């Protein structure tokens, strides 16, 4: 196993504030995957049409997405065990 490094993460004030998303779309082509994070605005639906806005797009290696999915599953399972 490779030596672990400690990352020093820096972020702009805008990125630190975060962005709200209530939906996502994942697509994979070859070695890369894309996650589109959306805000679906149900309050302004007109008939069958519901407006949705892309709030962020993340493109990453598919291998990293697989690692992320495993990490998310572990994290959510632990969270649910604690009773949310």
Residue ranges and their predicted role:
Residues 1-84:
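Positively charged, low-complexity terminal tracts
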């Amino acid at each position: 196993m490779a030596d672990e490094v400690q990352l020093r993460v820096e972020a702009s004030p805008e990125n630190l504030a975060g962005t709200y998303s209530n939906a996502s779309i994942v697509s994979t082509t070859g070695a890369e995957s894309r996650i589109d994070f959306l805000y679906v605005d149900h309050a302004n639906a007109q008939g069958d049409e519901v407006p949705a806005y892309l709030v962020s797009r993340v493109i990453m290696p598919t291998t990293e997405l697989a690692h992320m999915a495993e990490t998310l599953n572990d994290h959510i399972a632990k969270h649910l065990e604690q009773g949310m």
